[in-house]
Amino acid sequence: TTEGKVIKCKAAIAWEAGKPLSVEEIEVSPPKDHEVRVKIVATGVCRTDEHAINPSFKEGVFPVILGHEGAGIVESIGQGVSKFKPGDKVIPLYMPQCGHCKFCLNPKTNLCEKISKIKTPISDQEVMSDGTSRFTCKGKPIYHFMGTSTFSEYTVVSESSLAKIDAAAPLDKVCLIGCGFSTGYGAAINTAQVEPGSTCAVFGLGGVGLSAVMGCKAAGASKIFGIDINKDKFPLAKKLGATDCLNPQDIRKPVQEIIAEMTNGGVDFAIECIGNPDVMKAAFESTTVGWGTCVIVGVAVGEQSIPFSPMQLIMGRKIKATFFGGWKSVKSVPKLVSDYMAKKFDLDALVSHTLPLDKINDAFDLMNAGKSNRTILVF
């Protein structure tokens, strides 16, 4: 047994910004009080992982083990842990749910005060609660990422950053519930609160955007526009529920004007899944005056602003944003896994590539070239 011992294993380390990740042997310490050590079985690669090593993101810390969309099996537990035992299937949660802070006790939000830097959550939780790391490589401590660090064969997480899931769940699919799927699907269901018979537009058809399309369809939308500059994304978007797909580069006028023409003045709901302020503006302007709602999902790196006029708000449009799709994580993730097992939605369609950890830089290249929806790394 490895319980109580340091584990040597492989992990992908980001040593500095703008450089490829390096797969190295690391040491993972045993879990301390209220911590759990998890053997990661599969992890998705998300745009947010790329943001964290982007030179324009000034909050990044190095060296760091990225990854926040994983699934695995509990290897051992620290003192005081009662909800988990070795062998449990689990999903690490970058959005913790402690269950007793002012946010956890309020049904209006899924935030938790354990995310201490609510200003820039993707640079948060880079050490454990005692201020130290559980990872070392070549004698150096390595930072954690978002409290999860799933680009490692073993990771250590807080017990409030972990959900126990169905023992029969396929970890190489349900890992997507750790971020991308839940974020997009929840943006439609929870944050936008898409209504039956409504019209929707989803900007950006990567893994998150395709999940938002699924959410709009599940909520009963009658028309769902999928917008992307990569037309290779359109066939899958249509399979998952998009009724119309538009490429802004093929249109002579702004896409929001085309959408307004096709919907008698604009859609009821728009969801931006890219993280580009100009696209956020287009999404907002594609909604109808009177009651249009725009939900921002994409993470914009650095000091950027959305350029729109306050007058557009006076005319009854609303702009909202979402983090982890509005799901209270510990409570909702097991239910989402059960819904997947009951075939209420199709995660398998989102997985375009499966690669070993050693090929992690290929996964980033595929994502940056727009050639993947979601790549899963299997250990």
Swiss-Prot record:
The modification N-acetylthreonine is found at residue 1. Oxidation of 20-HETE is inhibited by low concentrations of N-heptylformamide. Oxidation of 20-HETE is a decreased by 55-65% by either all-trans-retinol or all-trans-retinoic acid. Strongly inhibited by omega-hydroxy fatty acids. The keyword Glycosyltransferase does not apply. NAD(+) binds at residues 204-209, 228, 233, 297-299, 374. CDD domains: alcohol_DH_class_I_II_IV. SUPFAM superfamilies: GroES-like (SSF50129), NAD(P)-binding Rossmann-fold domains (SSF51735). One of its GO terms (biological process) is formaldehyde catabolic process. It comes from the Eukaryota. It is an enzyme of class 1 (oxidoreductase). Its EC number is 1.1.1.105. Zn(2+) 2 binds at residues 98, 101, 104, 112. Binds 2 Zn(2+) ions per subunit. GO terms for cellular component: cytosol. Its cofactor is Zn(2+). One of its GO terms (molecular function) is S-(hydroxymethyl)glutathione dehydrogenase [NAD(P)+] activity. Keywords: Acetylation, Cytoplasm, Lipid metabolism, Metal-binding, NAD, Oxidoreductase, Zinc. Zn(2+) 1 binds at residues 46, 68, 179. It catalyses: all-trans-retinol + NAD(+) = all-trans-retinal + NADH + H(+); 9-cis-retinol + NAD(+) = 9-cis-retinal + NADH + H(+); 20-oxo-(5Z,8Z,11Z,14Z)-eicosatetraenoate + NAD(+) + H2O = (5Z,8Z,11Z,14Z)-eicosatetraenedioate + NADH + 2 H(+); 20-hydroxy-(5Z,8Z,11Z,14Z)-eicosatetraenoate + NAD(+) = 20-oxo-(5Z,8Z,11Z,14Z)-eicosatetraenoate + NADH + H(+). InterPro entries: ADH-like_C (IPR013149), ADH-like_N (IPR013154), ADH_Zn_CS (IPR002328), GroES-like_sf (IPR011032), NAD(P)-bd_dom_sf (IPR036291), PKS_ER (IPR020843). Gene3D superfamilies: Medium-chain alcohol dehydrogenases, catalytic domain (3.90.180.10), NAD(P)-binding Rossmann-like Domain (3.40.50.720). It is found in: Cytoplasm. Homodimer. Belongs to the zinc-containing alcohol dehydrogenase family. Class-II subfamily. PANTHER family: ALCOHOL DEHYDROGENASE (PTHR43880), ALL-TRANS-RETINOL DEHYDROGENASE [NAD(+)] ADH4 (PTHR43880:SF14). Catalyzes the NAD-dependent oxidation of either all-trans-retinol or 9-cis-retinol. Also oxidizes long chain omega-hydroxy fatty acids, such as 20-HETE, producing both the intermediate aldehyde, 20-oxoarachidonate and the end product, a dicarboxylic acid, (5Z,8Z,11Z,14Z)-eicosatetraenedioate. Also catalyzes the reduction of benzoquinones. This is All-trans-retinol dehydrogenase [NAD(+)] ADH4. It comes from Struthio camelus. The gene is ADH4.
